Amino acid sequence: MAILINKKTQVICQGFTGLQGTFHSEQAIAYGTNMVGGVTPGKGGHTHLDLPVYNTVHEAKAKTGANASVIYVPPGFAADSILEAIDAEIEVVVCITEGIPVLDMVKVKRALVGSKTRLIGPNCPGVITPGECKIGIMPGHIHKRGTIGIVSRSGTLTYEAVAQTTAVGLGQSTCIGIGGDPVNGTNFVDCIEMFLKDDETKAIIMIGEIGGNAEEDAAEFIKQSKIKKPIVSFIAGITAPPGKRMGHAGAIIVGRTGSAEDKLEALQSAGVIITRSPADIGKTMLDLLNKG
């Protein structure tokens, strides 16, 4: 039944009438996502893209029954937008915004504890259940309904894995970009746990990168999990020099932690199949499933 979102998910957009909110809402509607409205403070009572605009998330939820929100708000205001969605008890919140100050996200992280909200991102491409619901900036046409769950810190590498699994005929159950910032709402462990429990997901692709210990935590979880499914992983940044940030804010090797080799070793010890080239992700998964 996929995870997080499906054709019944009712989505609102925060930052609805802005340039990015408008463009990507149009794309989501064209894909078939059940967009029910949007939020732009001061523009409540108007319509945009033939959908109602509200001043607050609380009002939007009360009027539309929305249970998911996507946020296209500038970095300085994005954390407040997330907090507003948490306060309104929106179940799934996807924040696309890059560059949110770390201390702002620490406040958000604290607010998430004990809340009813699952935050995806920030600095992420979003979530898609192919053929049902697209929340985010990913190109919808490369996705195909299928059985592979994909979770990634990198947006463009997510698209690479999607295109390859589509090309070899496997397709995807749900694809999640968790984002490349050091403080995010949902991590690898959260997503892998959901995929392992999902009957529709037969195998998992996990795309990590240097920096932090999210991949090592995932390896330990996989090792301890009683539910087993085939998992293929690619880690970006094998040639990255220590101390140099590589694209994402969280992609930096500090001291003795966060290197690609450490992550690869941890994942291999958990039984994860490693591919060292992003061009081989789909083929590696297909070969693994054919062997099984």
UniProtKB/Swiss-Prot annotation:
Q: Which GO terms describe its cellular component?
A: succinate-CoA ligase complex (ADP-forming)
**Which reaction is this enzyme known to catalyze?**
succinate + ATP + CoA = succinyl-CoA + ADP + phosphate; GTP + succinate + CoA = succinyl-CoA + GDP + phosphate
Query: Which key words are in the record?
Result: Ligase, Nucleotide-binding, Tricarboxylic acid cycle
Q: Which GO terms describe its biological process?
A: tricarboxylic acid cycle
Binding of CoA occurs at 17-20, 43, 96-98
Its EC number(s): 6.2.1.5
* Pathway, per record: Carbohydrate metabolism; tricarboxylic acid cycle; succinate from succinyl-CoA (ligase route): step 1/1
A GO molecular-function descriptor: succinate-CoA ligase (ADP-forming) activity
Please name the InterPro entries in this protein's record. Answer: Cit_synth/succinyl-CoA_lig_AS, Citrt_syn/SCS-alpha_CS, CoA-bd, CoA_lig_alpha, NAD(P)-bd_dom_sf, SUCC_ACL_C, Succinyl-CoA_synth-like
Kindly list the positions annotated as binding substrate: 159
Keyword check for Nucleotide-binding: yes
Active site positions, chain numbering: 248
Q: Which domain of life is it from?
A: Bacteria
| One matching Pfam family | CoA_binding
Task: State how it assembles.
Answer: Heterotetramer of two alpha and two beta subunits.
Which family does the similarity line name? Answer: Belongs to the succinate/malate CoA ligase alpha subunit family.
Q: Which NCBIfam families match?
A: PRK05678.1, sucCoAalpha
Q: Which PANTHER family match?
A: SUCCINATE--COA LIGASE [ADP_GDP-FORMING] SUBUNIT ALPHA, MITOCHONDRIAL (PTHR11117:SF2), SUCCINYL-COA LIGASE SUBUNIT ALPHA (PTHR11117)
General function of this protein: Succinyl-CoA synthetase functions in the citric acid cycle (TCA), coupling the hydrolysis of succinyl-CoA to the synthesis of either ATP or GTP and thus represents the only step of substrate-level phosphorylation in the TCA. The alpha subunit of the enzyme binds the substrates coenzyme A and phosphate, while succinate binding and nucleotide specificity is provided by the beta subunit.
Listed name of the protein? Succinate--CoA ligase [ADP-forming] subunit alpha
Annotated source species: Rickettsia conorii (strain ATCC VR-613 / Malish 7)
